[in-house]
Amino acid sequence: MLELKQVGKVYQREQQTFTALSDISLKIEAGEIYGIIGYSGAGKSTLIRLLNGLEKPTSGDVLVNGQSIVGLSEQAMRPIRQKIGMIFQHFNLLWSKTILENIALPLKLAGVGKKERLAKAKEMLALVELTDLGAAYPSELSGGQKQRVAIARALISEPAILLCDEATSALDPKTTNSILSLLAKINQEMGITIVLVTHEMDAVRRICQRIAVMAAGRVIEEGTTQAIFETPQAEVTKAFVSESLVITPSETAASIEQLLTRVPEGTIIKLRFNEEQSSQPVIGQLMRRYPSVEVSVISGSLQQTINGALGYLYIQIQASPDDLKQALSDLSQQTIEVEVLRHG
């Protein structure tokens, strides 16, 4: 559906060159929700502009449905762009037009008759659950409602692809969740490929099947949502995952130090587990099996991803050397990832 092959993008600015993207290779399958995450300046927005042909790469190739769009003229790009919808952080609505007129605008520009385009706009209003607001104006709507209007407008031309550039960044958490649920519903009911570009790990965790992590113009890690959260490799990815799981490194370190002031003995361990393991009484089993084992919970978190639950648990174990060794072995045999952070 969408593919980038060794794409690079370099800008020339006042006798200086700025490399926005370097050697980007991605393949986004038809019908999936694909997340692209990175901090500001990572190159996310440049990448999304390459996907819809608003920018041309300096090197490499961009393919839409197997067709290279790099060398196409503006005229040749028009029918391709009609199948690519896009929403932004800012809603870009026309304040002097009603909500129905805003949604119908792409069809008006395409020469579709008034009766037909307004009928289609009403269908889109129903899809985004704003049926009663067709006669309202943008100034009367909340931020979440405005983004729903922007989504309806992007979908009215029946695109096969929806590009979302920081679409939830200006919204509060509750509204963000409602927009993400709407995008998931659209993907499921209409089969539209969605590319979600964001700096919010919680957003990609909730609805994306796969994720690419960007930093300094490169893709530094890519994989399924489950794999990225369970075993992040790059430091940037680990930071994103920690933020999403509400276990920041500084908070964890502070909790560990606080515990060690009270109980200086013991081994500090980080456990990482998935949905199946989260339902097992792991700690209770350890304490029953090894009478000398005492466990203190430092901090933990369990979150849902589209592929299932995953979580972290930081614990302190006090035990005899033999029991500790055997307990760690038992945990590992249950496919729980065990990381010893500090020996007692």
From Swiss-Prot:
It is found in: Cell membrane. It is an enzyme of class 7 (translocase). GO terms for molecular function: ABC-type D-methionine transporter activity; ATP binding; ATP hydrolysis activity. It catalyses: L-methionine(out) + ATP + H2O = L-methionine(in) + ADP + phosphate + H(+); D-methionine(out) + ATP + H2O = D-methionine(in) + ADP + phosphate + H(+). InterPro entries: AAA+_ATPase, ABC_transporter-like_ATP-bd, ABC_transporter-like_CS, ACT-like_dom_sf, MetN_ABC, MetN_ABC_transporter-like, NIL_domain, P-loop_NTPase. GO terms for cellular component: plasma membrane. The keyword Membrane applies. ATP binds at residues 38-45. It comes from the Bacteria. It is a peripheral membrane protein. Residues 2-241 form the ABC transporter domain. The keyword Cell inner membrane does not apply. PROSITE patterns: ABC_TRANSPORTER_1, ABC_TRANSPORTER_2, METN. Pfam families: ABC_tran, NIL. Keywords: Amino-acid transport, ATP-binding, Cell membrane, Membrane, Nucleotide-binding, Translocase, Transport. The complex is composed of two ATP-binding proteins (MetN), two transmembrane proteins (MetI) and a solute-binding protein (MetQ). Part of the ABC transporter complex MetNIQ involved in methionine import. Responsible for energy coupling to the transport system. PANTHER family: AMINO ACID IMPORT ATP-BINDING PROTEIN, METHIONINE IMPORT ATP-BINDING PROTEIN METN. Belongs to the ABC transporter superfamily. Methionine importer (TC 3.A.1.24) family. This is Methionine import ATP-binding protein MetN. It comes from Latilactobacillus sakei subsp. sakei (strain 23K) (Lactobacillus sakei subsp. sakei). The lineage of its organism: Bacteria, Bacillati, Bacillota, Bacilli, Lactobacillales. The gene is metN.
